[in-house]
Amino acid sequence: MSGLKAGDSFPSDVVFSYIPWSEDKGEITACGIPINYNASKEWADKKVILFALPGAFTPVCSARHVPEYIEKLPEIRAKGVDVVAVLAYNDAYVMSAWGKANQVTGDDILFLSDPDARFSKSIGWADEEGRTKRYALVIDHGKITYAALEPAKNHLEFSSAETVLKHL
């Protein structure tokens, strides 16, 4: 498959690895237990922003991409978005720690792992190194309403929170 586009259905059986945030595991050094997060099922009746990036704790991702979504979360929620999720090829432990490092609690933003970039590869949006590329999807009750892939690893425009907000 060569990407997703507006009007497509979100694929079935998309499962990510995820460690849900919990208060007793809120410290960055505390380890939770990864679960299989069936995005296809969980998001079937929700409005969702899924944004992907090349890796946790990397410069553009940590300095700009995730902080912008955190900052714009109230505006995003005001537009009726139920779920905001960030996706990278890193394992669930790294993604969980990254969420904690960004002081994200509860389910404000889900920090999901795309093991071996399976999902990103399946839609043609993984790089030659096997990492997730930088992209954004808006999914509304199982239908893609916005899909954008950045032209380069360090480019941040089409998948930014500011741009995605304009497409809600």
UniProtKB/Swiss-Prot annotation:
Stretches assigned to coiled coil: none
* A GO CC term assigned to this protein in UniProt: peroxisome
One GO molecular-function entry: IgE binding
Recite the UniProt keywords alphabetically.
Answer: Allergen, Antioxidant, Disulfide bond, Oxidoreductase, Peroxidase, Redox-active center
What the protein does comes down to: Thiol-specific peroxidase that catalyzes the reduction of hydrogen peroxide and organic hydroperoxides to water and alcohols, respectively. Plays a role in cell protection against oxidative stress by detoxifying peroxides and as sensor of hydrogen peroxide-mediated signaling events. Required for virulence.
According to the record's subunit comment, the protein's assembly and interactions are: Homodimer; disulfide-linked, upon oxidation.
Task: Return the protein name.
Answer: Peroxiredoxin Asp f3
Species, as recorded: Aspergillus fumigatus (strain ATCC MYA-4609 / CBS 101355 / FGSC A1100 / Af293)
Q: What is the lineage of its organism?
A: Eukaryota, Fungi, Dikarya, Ascomycota, Pezizomycotina
